[in-house]
């Protein structure tokens, strides 16, 4: 009965233990990127730049000022996956009965004595304390089987922060200039411009996630680009474009079952939540109508996030 149960288990382990495709998913930067990461970072940047509303700049000569948050680093995930080879470890032992027979040599001793006409005869039988023959016989069958499962947990994450990658900044700057040109807007030097356009890149990096739910597992790599831009007329210092925020996220996902696969690979891009704090509500001093100037406490543009009581208290007291 046990043999019938073990045969399909061992066969399944043998077949499934070799099923799988490993695709390295490094964090942003930290060496040569692979194609999927390049595609995601470029897609999120292109979407964020393409979605900029530049209609108010039509027919103008603009000077671009682009500032980018440091975005380069490295990271690694170690461990955290199922160990399929552990399915054939541990043991159950069924030992057969063993019987051993020994044959010991025997010898006979005869002694004759004569004294005063009397004769005596003594015969003795002795056995040596060393077997001359040993025979071992086993009855029944023996077997050994095992069944187990090892879970590696969530694994360990290590990261390293480096300096800003100038090539990323240059690439993003070229994307912005390309969109301006395709929209019919002239990008000139600051000396010849009549409009200044400021673009702040707050988020330009990747997020890596690993999901482990026993039967279902997934590896996810996301790239996010979040920027805020506004335009100022040099002549009268008025805002042609008030501060606006664009945020897009590109994702690559591999789905596994017991870390075998991936049985499904998907890619996509979508708008994501905006900046936690933006400048859309800031006005020049004297233009706001309230009793107090706009503050971070009144910024509810980022739904789903709030400020802790301690953060609000420190802000009111003027603490950093």
Curated annotation (Swiss-Prot):
Signal peptide: 1-18
Record key words, sorted: Cell adhesion, Cell outer membrane, Lipoprotein, Membrane, Palmitate, Signal, Virulence
Lipid attachment points (S-diacylglycerol cysteine): 19
GO CC annotations on file: cell outer membrane
Bilayer topology: Lipid-anchor
Compartment list: Cell outer membrane
Major site of localization recorded for this protein: membrane
Lipid-conjugated positions (N-palmitoyl cysteine): 19
GO biological process terms on file: cell adhesion
Region of interest called Disordered, as start-end residue ranges on this chain: 287-320
Protein family membership: Belongs to the MafA family.
Name the record gives this protein: Adhesin MafA 1/4
Biological source species: Neisseria gonorrhoeae (strain ATCC 700825 / FA 1090)
